[in-house]
Design a protein with these regions (language model features):
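Beta-strand-centric surfaces of beta-sandwich/beta-rich domains
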Residues: 2-169
Length: 169
């Protein structure tokens, strides 16, 4: 595995009304490397349980993706714990509404976001409430190409709201 190609320079998180969380993260990324990383949940938001592990993949042409998976989250003590349970019978299963989402590389919005479960592809910036992701799904964010060996800053700003009733979806 290559050395980490990024430096996390900013992370700010806040709770809203006890059931929502939003954060702004800045990553300084060097392309043409592959790395795995996860983000810690700030104190006081463990109950929301919505941060997911990230896998950064660099392809041969210098483009890269950040994929979100429902596992391998670390809390403030560094202990991994599950975020989603894909068992429909699980009382812990939730719907997440992500709103708003703005992703940019070097100040430019990403090309699109792909939701594998539905096959939807949407632009890189979203009005509030425009994206729904079921707990058994993943969210894949595709960034603009970065020339191999180049670098750019990645900004992600997002809000997660926990909705207990997924049965109605």
């Amino acid at each position: 595995m290559a050395s980490n190609p990024y430096t996390r320079t900013t992370m700010e998180g806040h709770t809203v009304a006890g059931n929502a969380f939003y954060a702004t993260i800045k990553l300084s990324v060097t392309a043409s490397q592959t790395s795995y990383y996860s983000l810690s949940i700030p104190a006081g938001v463990q109950d929301v349980c919505v941060f997911m592990s990230r896998e950064m993949v660099t392809s041969s042409n210098g483009a890269w993706l950040i994929s979100h998976y429902p596992n391998a989250v670390v809390d403030t003590t560094g202990t991994p714990f599950p975020v989603f349970n894909a068992n429909p019978q699980s009382a812990k299963q939730t719907q997440l509404q992500i709103s708003p989402v703005t992703v940019s590389v070097a100040g430019q919005p990403v090309d699109e976001v792909y939701l594998p479960a539905s096959g939807r592809r949407i632009g890189g910036n979203y009005p509030q409430g425009s994206i729904r992701v079921q707990s058994e799904g993943s969210l894949v964010v595709g960034a603009k190409s970065i020339t191999a060996g180049g670098s750019a800053d990645l900004y992600i700003t997002y809000t997660w709201i926990q909705v207990p009733n997924i049965q109605d979806l």
